[in-house]
Amino acid sequence: MFSIIQNIEKEQIKKNIPVFRSGDTIEVKVWVIEGSKKRLQSFEGIVIAIKNRCLNSSFTVRKISNGEGVERVFQTHSHGIEEILVKRKGLVRKAKLYYLRTRTGKAARIKERLN
């Protein structure tokens, strides 16, 4: 039974996902359907959490839009994601950056990882 589930999950998993970690600034291009139109929408922000659960893997991206914090959770292997681009690598010491929710301005900055 378990091997059947694993075989089905292997077929569904995307292979072209770049390596990124918490603290990285990424741009996610997502297909959005509005009425009968289908277009690509870009969402750029800092990765504040990653959950690795095989096919149920997800990551949370946070950005500031018009002074308001906006968070969006993406399923890593979703068919709605066209591509993920890593813009900047961040230097952080925690896996979950939920403390950024309470910080604004310069306090919410993350140092860049140079390697």
Swiss-Prot record:
MF-aspect GO terms: structural constituent of ribosome
Species of provenance: Buchnera aphidicola subsp. Acyrthosiphon pisum (strain APS)
UniProt cross-references to InterPro entries, sorted A to Z: Ribosomal_bL19, Ribosomal_bL19_CS, Ribosomal_bL19_sf, Translation_prot_SH3-like_sf
Protein name: Large ribosomal subunit protein bL19
UniProt superkingdom: Bacteria
Any single Gene Ontology cellular-component annotation: cytosolic large ribosomal subunit
Role, per record: This protein is located at the 30S-50S ribosomal subunit interface and may play a role in the structure and function of the aminoacyl-tRNA binding site.
Similarity field: Belongs to the bacterial ribosomal protein bL19 family.
NCBIfam families: rplS_bact
Keywords attached to this entry: Ribonucleoprotein, Ribosomal protein
